[in-house]
Amino acid sequence: MDLGSEVKVIRYEDFGAVGDGITDDSAAIRAAHNAANEAGLPVLARKDASYYIGSLESTIVVKTSTDWNGAQLIFDDSTIHWESNLRTTYVFTVNPDVEPTSIPVPEGLTLSKGQTNVGLSFDKPCMIKIESAGDKIYRRYGENANGGVDKNEMILVDEDGNVDPTTPIQYNYSTVTKITVYSTDDAPVSIGNARIKTVVPQPKKIDPDYDNHYCYYGRGIAVRRSNTTLYDIKHSIEGEDMTIEIDRNGDGIIDFWGADRSYGVPYIGFFYFVGCNKATLTDSLLQGHQAYSFWQGATRNEPGNIRNEMGSYDLNATDCINLSLLNLTQYENKETGEVITNRKMYHGVMGSNFCRNVVMDNCYVDRFDSHQGVHNARITNCTLGFGILVIGGGELYVENVHRVGGNAFIHLRMDYNSVFDGDVTVKNCRCGEQMKILIEGRWVKFYNGLDNHVTNNLTVDGLVCDSGEFAFYSIRNLEPTSTTDDVNRLYLPEKIVASNVFAADGVTPLVPEISEQKDAFSATKLIIK
């Protein structure tokens, strides 16, 4: 199609889109974005349209701003088989102008924690991913155990290789085996103003044996481009509504609330940010997903077989720096649109891995979660249900946050040995009436590849405890530990500084214990102001 110099905006209808919610508009939408990308023009949808996307064979690449103009988009995943490549093909992918590239690594290159220059030069300031093959970190134990991943991190550098002070090198690298360079100067794009409905698969209608397969679907909008903003997107789900109760231990006690996998599948994340700097998701409604389960053995009837949990997410991020999550609300896919506050079967609104400098502000969601580490997180002006689940390091700053349920305000993820090598600040926050612990973790003699720090320093300035009783820490399975520098050494907090801690009335002062495990925390200094 010859656009001509007079064309200032690309419309789907110019390429044959119907927008009636029935006709498959995939080809027209793809052609429109291809033309927009080539011409560097924005895309504008029809306000009253309902665009059905059903026969997508590959992702639709977006590189320019897109205003969906309040239209509805229907992503029909209902017929996608779990073995199909489409299972992890995002409907839209916001791509950079220049793809990431691997560069030659000088033989014998080593890097140290806190090193201020990587010893390499670059064409321009950029983001780089450093990797060390075979040196595993974030080994995981428990139901979903694995052997970890190669040590890696994302940092910002200038053309002379100087490390940006906001992304200091976190680890020691005896051997650097790979460096990947990502552009950070992509022209800003904004994409949004839409209602998007995902029609989820009904897997057992496609494959009767699906129930015993551990697999995730990756569909929705993926962002790989720096300086990208997703805004005003209201996401909903159709077809995920059959809740089941499970007695995993056979003791007559229901200990898992999940979803029947005949009626839906677990998702990696509808919104998925990966390998980008300064990306934002704002002013949007997120869908709370039901947790799922799978049979650990070959068949459900295998003796001793159990179901394991699979979280399902509407938002996920990997290898991102300066990610902002602003003004987000999580809701159920019910007629009432009820906001979720602490329902375990709907816990999975967010997951993340290897991100740095993450901001969550003015959000009403179930949880902030970092699976394989976050370095620097700031959570402010939020109401959270399932909670704050973190491992990693740097600084965790939490201000004006109300945690409405659960037994602990902050959970250090127990499946990664509750490692957080950094400081925690809690300011002007409120804990729900069942909550009696500020920070909870679990420790076993399990080396996840990192030193076992259970936070370094804790500062509390303003905390209302609705339960009326409180302890700063509770670390499960805590036992006398080695004082030598072996991998099983546990590093407990050095210092706690607390002020303005009150009971539910906000007036009666509370003086929390460090922990019920007093002997183990004997070296931790507590300062009450």
Segment roles from a protein language model:
Residues 67, 91-113, 119-134, 184-206, ...:
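Parallel beta-helix/beta-solenoid
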Residues 60-65, 180-192, 219-235, 254-256, ...:
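Surface-exposed loop/turn motifs in large extracellular/passenger domains
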Residues 55-56, 75-80, 200-206, 238-269, ...:
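Short glycine/acidic-rich loop motifs that flank beta-strands on beta-rich extracellular proteins
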